[in-house]
Amino acid sequence: MGRGAGREYSPAATTAENGGGKKKQKEKELDELKKEVAMDDHKLSLDELGRKYQVDLSKGLTNQRAQDILARDGPNALTPPPTTPEWVKFCRQLFGGFSILLWIGAILCFLAFGIQAAMEDEPSNDNLYLGVVLAAVVIVTGCFSYYQEAKSSKIMDSFKNMVPQQALVVREGEKMQINAEEVVVGDLVEVKGGDRVPADLRIISSHGCKVDNSSLTGESEPQTRSPEFTHENPLETRNICFFSTNCVEGTARGIVIATGDRTVMGRIATLASGLEVGRTPIAMEIEHFIQLITGVAVFLGVSFFVLSLILGYSWLEAVIFLIGIIVANVPEGLLATVTVCLTLTAKRMARKNCLVKNLEAVETLGSTSTICSDKTGTLTQNRMTVAHMWFDNQIHEADTTEDQSGATFDKRSPTWTALSRIAGLCNRAVFKAGQENISVSKRDTAGDASESALLKCIELSCGSVRKMRDRNPKVAEIPFNSTNKYQLSIHEREDSPQSHVLVMKGAPERILDRCSSILVQGKEIPLDKEMQDAFQNAYLELGGLGERVLGFCQLNLPSAKFPRGFKFDTDELNFPTEKLCFVGLMSMIDPPRAAVPDAVGKCRSAGIKVIMVTGDHPITAKAIAKGVGIISEGNETVEDIAARLNIPVSQVNPREAKACVVHGSDLKDMTSEQLDEILKNHTEIVFARTSPQQKLIIVEGCQRQGAIVAVTGDGVNDSPALKKADIGIAMGIAGSDVSKQAADMILLDDNFASIVTGVEEGRLIFDNLKKSIAYTLTSNIPEITPFLLFIIANIPLPLGTVTILCIDLGTDMVPAISLAYEAAESDIMKRQPRNPQTDKLVNERLISMAYGQIGMIQALGGFFTYFVILAENGFLPSRLLGIRLDWDDRSMNDLEDSYGQEWTYEQRKVVEFTCHTAFFASIVVVQWADLIICKTRRNSVFQQGMKNKILIFGLLEETALAAFLSYCPGMGVALRMYPLKVTWWFCAFPYSLLIFIYDEVRKLILRRYPGGWVEKETYY
């Protein structure tokens, strides 16, 4: 990854070879990035390192040389991912998906108006109005959804940290603070506890340095860093520090071996931004829906075009009819309805701590069938907590809950007093200042995670650790190092004025080796074989729980030999460190969050497979997986079965094990077929010790199985997987910027349980969108049939274009949106995730219900009203057939009705427009029933109840609007709507009732005979 690595990725070299095959090149680069990190700097000796980078290991680079390298390599910063320009985003909203249908409609309208204007003397302006309205609808809705997304991305931008990072470099022998962006390859850099590592470093000297690699590898434990080469894999060796990880304690010096995009972190970020993102399921649904609607529209249009030519219309009139029918089929209000429904759900999710970045992701979460979750910080609290102690030869359980409501143990034993004193004194962690009023478990600490856990545990059970330290002042200490694996300090004893106590903690087996006695019930007894076995059992048991175990021992130094003021020498040890007294063990774990087990259970009953993918140890990963229920009670892995039957693992049939823990190093050597085999045959899977590249491979594996995959994660290492998944979920509090950019949704409270709420909302909106669409499409039939009869039977036009718009954009809007607030019919979280291949948003059954059944009854209601009004005015239905040409003839002012009365053109038109208004009112009346039956797809409306207040408001609103349009003075001029006799409103009532009864009977049959032909034909 050093100087030579820059050339591996030079795109220029590859493009020349494939003759500009951009796509191939991109795939090649992605495969490059998917490979594990390749570098050899960690294997070089210090002299070789100095030669390779032409740098003096004590004085650093010269200023001039640093300038040259900076000019050559560019600044040490990650290239920001290519963002979509705002105007492109806006155009996507304006011309994407559903809007295209409306645009085509608008263009056809202008076309028809153009034809009419050219051919007729006094063309009607209907088509012009219609075109303008359609265009306006698209533009307004487009602006609305653009505004919604812009709002989410505003919140996103506020996450970015604006503080420029500083780095401490040595150049020409002088230490200097520079901006981290100016660090170059070969620079000599110093880091200390609390710093962010400014670039990839090869360590050349260190003092107790530990780094937190969790954002890169997912290990929650701080890792020691020292100059020794300890591992072939650069990610595991101790002598490399990675860009943007944090140094937790100690100090180190290192040589920069890679900067910016060439760092390990940079490669992962590049990998994430280079991934092709698939379309969201809802986008595909809407596309499928548009194809269906367009199919119906074109079929109707063309068949009536041919029919009108046969009936002897001129081809021009036939074209106008064709356009009219296609436009009448376009549900103008639906685009707005879908957008508003998704927005409402997004807002509801934001209140429940899920921030959705793009509206379409709302539904994706509902169709999720696999969740790949990160462990650290998502399933767990991301803070080490003391879980168990072993003293007086028994294991005691500590309280690991978030709100301190869990187990307590007997604190009266003198051994516990001794153990808590060692844990408090032999400990360098401290609480940061000014947090007195915050609960202990929530306080920030300075120091190593394990020590902080001990500090909090002792503070909670024994009171102030600071006072304990003040009463027992420290006189000497040896900090923890990796060779002797212990930490030791000597304190003046508060309980005897002359003497000192030596306290020590460290790796349990190392501590036990230094002890000759053990403290039981406050008395020292010799450490015999029996006690050693007891220790061994306790150590194995706690280790097997995936916990990190520390041993504690002490020695009361005799005051005769070591009086107060004695100079302890920690280099030439002038005090005993053997024959100590063993006191006990304490073990720590990063405990699961309180709400997670419940959430995992809900996922399981919802048919969602939860897979844990973590960089942590297999044992810890398995322990947490069992703790949160990802591996459920009684399910065994191959290893468990082998241990139970006492046979080697190779003899167990892997198919017998439901659960499975896969190690990253095994995953590395697997073919995709083997991975598919694992994903297929095991229901409960944990991947441990995985690298970021492997996360990506796992996600792709799940997608090959046809799953819709959600991935949660917070580290930079999760970003490629977040981007590749169908929906990426990042953590709002602990998440890194890179992961938030790659994600589609952000959990503001970092809680896995919020995902379950998201799934529920996503499933609900899918159901409710179906209902909304069914409701909206139904009124299409009573809008189209008048036009068809006008062509075939030559009757006066029963319903005008303007009135159609009043229905689609006026009365139908609020009721359609109100269905988004409808409560779930059954327990949504008990059914399997929908299959995107078979379970579509709009299917043939929905179309047949809306168009073929309910829509037809509605049309009958409208025509009934139309014929009643004309008959009351003297035109009986028999007289109307074939009257159209005379009726629309301006020069004909003496048209006779069935009773011989003569009608002028103006009088006829008033009656015609009154009919339009009445037809419109009838549609409103039958849409009442349609709205109520659309509340449920299977249950009876009486089971569901009328709890949806918005829906009741919608019913009242559409009625009030219809009445207003009919009776408001001046409407006759503006929209050609005329006042109606009260009785005419009631003509459609029987049809409304018929719709309600028809559908209730249908749903009754559905419930009585599940899977019968009624369900096959009508259950949408």
From Swiss-Prot:
GO terms for molecular function: ATP binding; ATP hydrolysis activity; P-type sodium:potassium-exchanging transporter activity; potassium ion binding; protein-folding chaperone binding; sodium ion binding; steroid hormone binding. Its EC number is 7.2.2.13. The active site is at residue 374. One of its GO terms (biological process) is negative regulation of heart contraction. Residues 6-85, 151-286, 337-769, 821-840, 936-948, 1004-1020 are cytoplasmic. Keywords: ATP-binding, Cell membrane, Ion transport, Magnesium, Membrane, Metal-binding, Nucleotide-binding, Phosphoprotein, Potassium, Potassium transport, Sodium, Sodium transport, Sodium/potassium transport, Translocase, Transmembrane, Transmembrane helix, Transport. Residues 107-129, 307-318, 790-799, 864-915, 968-982 are extracellular. Belongs to the cation transport ATPase (P-type) (TC 3.A.3) family. Type IIC subfamily. The sodium/potassium-transporting ATPase is composed of a catalytic alpha subunit, an auxiliary non-catalytic beta subunit and an additional regulatory subunit. Interacts with regulatory subunit FXYD1. This is Sodium/potassium-transporting ATPase subunit alpha-2. It comes from Bos taurus. The lineage of its organism: Eukaryota, Metazoa, Chordata, Craniata, Vertebrata. The gene is ATP1A2.
